[in-house]
Amino acid sequence: MLRAGAPTAGSFRTKEVHTGTTIMAVEFDGGVVVGSDSRVSAGEAVVNRVFDKLSPLHQRIFCALSGSAADAQAIADMAAYQLELHGLELEEPPLVLAAANVVKNISYKYREDLLAHLIVAGWDQREGGQVYGTMGGMLIRQPFTIGGSGSSYIYGYVDAAYKPGMTSEECRRFTTNAITLAMNRDGSSGGVIYLVTITVAGVDHRVILGDELPKFYDE
């Protein structure tokens, strides 16, 4: 028997599916690390526990998705299509800055219709590893950036823990710790952690399962 006020199967149909999220990207000398949690929710329901929020835009360029799952993926798909054409016209891979500008322009053009925030990160021969935030049509390069609902819980940690000149392994550890802390505090973040490391050598994908996440004293 359903109790009063309990969500029903039909009630979830009107709820927009959100990647209530923690996303992050960090530059290091020679590349970038991009990471995210994997929980997707619709209202009070978790509709996907292992959704990969790191979407490829080109060979060595990825974006991290947050906001409405459909809107964020639509922006990523449109950007990937434009960058594929851009690369064919130039006969060389597009620059990370070009990819970030494409995402920024799409986000701004459809700002009244789409609810999404994407972080663009990757490697190119001109500038090496780069991280760009694109919220609301803004474009800014940063040594690291965070986003999503879980990010509000970890600003203090990332500001204190970030050190210029970190290695790729230190950046992976930094990203893993930050996302784990956000998952512990934010009810909309959870699941596993996806990590992508992008360098001149290629793209390295890793998945950190729940029983492999770092432990903190407050757990």
Swiss-Prot record:
Residues the UniProt record annotates as site (Cleavage): 20-21
Propeptide: 1-20
Positions where N6-acetyllysine occurs in the chain: 53, 109
Catalytically driven reaction(s): Cleavage of peptide bonds with very broad specificity
Chief localization: cytoplasm
Pfam families: Proteasome
Compartments where found: Cytoplasm; Nucleus
Keyword annotations from UniProtKB, A to Z: Acetylation, Cytoplasm, Hydrolase, Immunity, Nucleus, Protease, Proteasome, Threonine protease, Zymogen
One of the record's GO cellular component terms: proteasome core complex
Enzyme class: hydrolase
UniProt GO molecular function: threonine-type endopeptidase activity
GO biological process, one term: immune system process
Residue positions of the active site: 21
Record EC number: 3.4.25.1
Induction field: Up-regulated by interferon gamma (at protein level).
Post-translational modification as stated in the protein's UniProt record: Autocleaved. The resulting N-terminal Thr residue of the mature subunit is responsible for the nucleophile proteolytic activity.
Function, as annotated: The proteasome is a multicatalytic proteinase complex which is characterized by its ability to cleave peptides with Arg, Phe, Tyr, Leu, and Glu adjacent to the leaving group at neutral or slightly basic pH. The proteasome has an ATP-dependent proteolytic activity. This subunit is involved in antigen processing to generate class I binding peptides.
Further details from the record: Encoded in the MHC class II region.
Family according to the record: Belongs to the peptidase T1B family.
UniProt subunit comment: The 26S proteasome consists of a 20S proteasome core and two 19S regulatory subunits. The 20S proteasome core is composed of 28 subunits that are arranged in four stacked rings, resulting in a barrel-shaped structure. The two end rings are each formed by seven alpha subunits, and the two central rings are each formed by seven beta subunits. The catalytic chamber with the active sites is on the inside of the barrel. Component of the immunoproteasome, where it displaces the equivalent housekeeping subunit PSMB6.
Protein name (database record): Proteasome subunit beta type-9
Species this chain originates from: Mus platythrix (Flat-haired mouse)
Gene behind the chain: Psmb9
